[in-house]
A protein has these predicted regions:
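C-terminal scaffold of the Radical SAM
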Residues: 1-266
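Generic N-terminal initiation segments characterized by hydrophobic and/or small/turn-forming residues
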Residues: 110, 272, 281, 298-301
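Short, ordered coil/turn segments that flank beta-strands lining enzyme active or ligand-binding pockets
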Residues: 185, 280, 295
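Short amphipathic alpha-helical interaction segments
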Residues: 265-277
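A short, conserved structural fragment
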Residues: 279-289
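Minor-groove-contacting beta-hairpin "wing" of winged helix-turn-helix DNA-binding domains
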Residues: 290-294
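Short, amphipathic alpha-helical interaction segments positioned at domain boundaries
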Residues: 296-309
Length: 309
C-alpha cells in the first residue's frame, strides 16, 4: 500500500493540476490488516476523506477459506481506527461463502452494523473464471439458503437505517458513494496510473481506455511517450444499449428515460423490444419515464440485463 507521504505527494500533484470541488469525495481502498490500519491517520492528513475496507467476514474460518491475510479481530481494529480518522467509511461484506450458515451470516452483519458506518456493501460471492475457487469449487450454500441469508440481512440493514440504493450497496441518508453513482449512471471517468481504466465520451463516440498494467512499464511509457495507453476501444452503437443497461439497472431508483439518449446518443426506441419483454416478465417498472428494475428485476438482474444484448 502506498505510504502516507506518497499519498500526500500524489494528492498535491492532482490538486496542482485539477480544480477539485471543496467537498470532493477522495476514497482509498484498504485491507484491514493492522499495519495498514495504523497508517490511517497519515492518509487522512494527506486528504483522504473516505475509506473502503475489504472486511468480507468477521469469521476467521471464512477469511482463511477466502485466502485473506487478516482475521476477525484485525478487521474490527481497522474499522475502529478508520472511524476515528475518516469522514466516511464503507465496509465490504460477502455472503454465500463456503459452508456459511444463516447464523454465521447474521453474526457478520450484526458485528458490521454495530460500528454504525455510513455505508455498507453486501456482495454475493461469485466464482470468477481463472481463479482458485473456479478450478476447485468449494461447497457453497444452496440457492434457497443464499436467498434466506440475503432476506435476513436485508431486514437487519433496513432496521438499522440503511437504504439499498444499488443492487449491492447500502447507505445512511446522503451517504451514497459518489464515484460509484457516476459509474452506475454511465458517467465518464478518467483512469490514471498503472492498470487504470477510463470511459470518455466524445461528440461522436464513447471509448473505453486501459493503461499499462505493470507500474514499471507504465512509468517507462509515460517518460518516453507521455502516454501509457494500451487500449482505446470505441463502444459500438450495437453494444451501447447493453453497456448502459448493465450499469443503470443496478440502481434501485433507476434513471430517467431521457438519460438513455443523453448518455448514449441513441433514441430510446432502439431498446423497445427489450423494454417490452422486461415489462411482460415483471422485471421492469411500468413507469414510462423511468428505466428501473422491479424487486424481481433486481433479484434476477443478470436475466434482465441480458434482454438488452
Amino acid at each position: 500500500l502506498l505510504s502516507a507521504e506518497g499519498m500526500d505527494q500524489l494528492l498535491c500533484a492532482i490538486r496542482a493540476r485539477v480544480n477539485l470541488e471543496p467537498d470532493a469525495e477522495i476514497t482509498m481502498e484498504a485491507n484491514p490488516g493492522s499495519v495498514e490500519a495504523e497508517k490511517f491517520a497519515g492518509f487522512a492528513k494527506a486528504g483522504i476523506n473516505r475509506v473502503s475496507l475489504g472486511i468480507q467476514s468477521f469469521q476467521d474460518a471464512q477469511l482463511k477459506a477466502l485466502g485473506r491475510i487478516h482475521n476477525g479481530e484485525e478487521a474490527k481494529h481497522a474499522i475502529a481506527i478508520a472511524l476515528q480518522h475518516f469522514k466516511s467509511v464503507n465496509l465490504d461484506l460477502m455472503f454465500g461463502l463456503p459452508n456459511q450458515s444463516l447464523e454465521a451470516a447474521r453474526s457478520d452483519m450484526e458485528i458490521a452494523l454495530s460500528f454504525k458506518t455510513p455505508h455498507l456493501s453486501f456482495y454475493n460471492l461469485t466464482l470468477e473464471p481463472n481463479t482458485y475457487f473456479a478450478s476447485f469449487p468449494p461447497k457453497l450454500p444452496s440457492e434457497d439458503e443464499i436467498d434466506a441469508i440475503f432476506e435476513q440481512n436485508l431486514k437487519l440493514l433496513e432496521a438499522a437505517g440503511y437504504r439499498r440504493y444499488e443492487v449491492s450497496a447500502y447507505a445512511k441518508k446522503d451517504q451514497e458513494c459518489k464515484h460509484n453513482l457516476n459509474y452506475w449512471r454511465f458517467g465518464d471517468y478518467i483512469g490514471i496510473g498503472a492498470g487504470a481504466h477510463g470511459k470518455i465520451s466524445f461528440p461522436d463516440k464513447i471509448t473505453r481506455q486501459v493503461r499499462e498494467r505493470h507500474p514499471e512499464t507504465y512509468m517507462q511509457a509515460m517518460e518516453t511517450k507521455g502516454n501509457a495507453l494500451i487500449e482505446a476501444r470505441e463502444i459500438s452503437a450495437k453494444d451501447l444499449p447493453f453497456e448502459f443497461m448493465l450499469n443503470t439497472l443496478r440502481l434501485t431508483d433507476g434513471v430517467d428515460t431521457v438519460t438513455f439518449e443523453e448518455r448514449t446518443g441513441l433514441p430510446l426506441n432502439v431498446v423497445s423490444k427489450g423494454l417490452d419483454e422486461a415489462s411482460k416478465k415483471g422485471l421492469l417498472d411500468p413507469n414510462p419515464n423511468k428505466l428501473k428494475a422491479t424487486e424481481q428485476g433486481l433479484r434476477y438482474l443478470n436475466n434482465l440485463q441480458e434482454l438488452f444484448l
